[in-house]
Amino acid sequence: MRPYELMVIIDPEVEERTVESSLQKFLNVITTDGGTIEKVDIWGRRRLAYDIKKKSEGIYAVVNFTAAPATAKELDRQLSLNETIMRTKIIRPEDQKVVAE
């Protein structure tokens, strides 16, 4: 299992209060394959740097989770098939080791 961070930009026409419940449908892929969801952080409606699908705003959400690489790939595939998801990005955060001097 590896740690991942997922950032999702959701269509602004979706109501903000339903964002977490609609994301949960996709995040079930992680838990059914044995992964864990550490944190779901809904940033809310933000202005985009450039228009995506003729929209200048989007609802941002960041999810930290642990899963197998195949599970992360499947999650990205399922998110890309949904029309309300404007953009996704899954990254593996670097190990941040602090060296004491």
Swiss-Prot record:
One GO BP annotation of this record: translation
Looking up Pfam families in the UniProt record yields: Ribosomal_S6 (PF01250)
Q: Name one GO molecular function term.
A: structural constituent of ribosome
List, alphabetically, the PROSITE patterns matched.
RIBOSOMAL_S6
Q: What does this protein do?
A: Binds together with bS18 to 16S ribosomal RNA.
User: Of which family is this protein a member?
Assistant: Belongs to the bacterial ribosomal protein bS6 family.
Q: Which NCBIfam families match?
A: S6
This chain belongs to the protein called: Small ribosomal subunit protein bS6
Organism field: Paenarthrobacter aurescens (strain TC1)
